[in-house]
Amino acid sequence: MDALTALWLPVLVSAAAVWFWHFLSWAALSLHGKDWDGLPDEDRFTNALRELNIPPGNYVFPHDDARARSSDPEFKARFKAKWQAGPIGLINVWPAKMSMGGKMIGSFLVNLLVSALIAYLASITLKPGDGFLRVTQVVVTAGILSYSFAQLHTGIWFNAKPRAMIMAVIDGVVSGVLIGVIFAAMWPGG
């Protein structure tokens, strides 16, 4: 079966369903509201960032410049002292008037790509006419793997709260089930 022709509608519908679920989860139901903490003195912190005029980007502190570290013993000593004294952290700096529209479109495009890849996997694993449960089994598994487990590495390495990691996995399971049920309901010959 040609996955892109026979499965284009479930790809689109499942991408939209997952996008809508993530909107509900994050915005409407606020299930992730407790994933983040506020800073004790947010105004002082943000004023300091403004004064430093840090452009949008991803930052780590202390910054380990591998090139300098490999050749400069003084850099090694300074870095080690900073590392031991703390704090250690990551900062994502966004523009002052960030648009959510671009983020929403980007999320939908990722969902579309994931659904298309799952459609490809399903098309080489399943046959037209395979039953609802068999299609669900394969597609839900692929969906959960796609949406849940990559989040765990990010959480481990970037110090996410356990609750945030659990919520990310739950979101991924719901996303996987949505994709699986949609694909099974719209499976060719089913």
Regions found by a protein language model. Give the residues of each.
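Juxtamembrane/disordered regions of integral membrane proteins
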Residues: 1-190
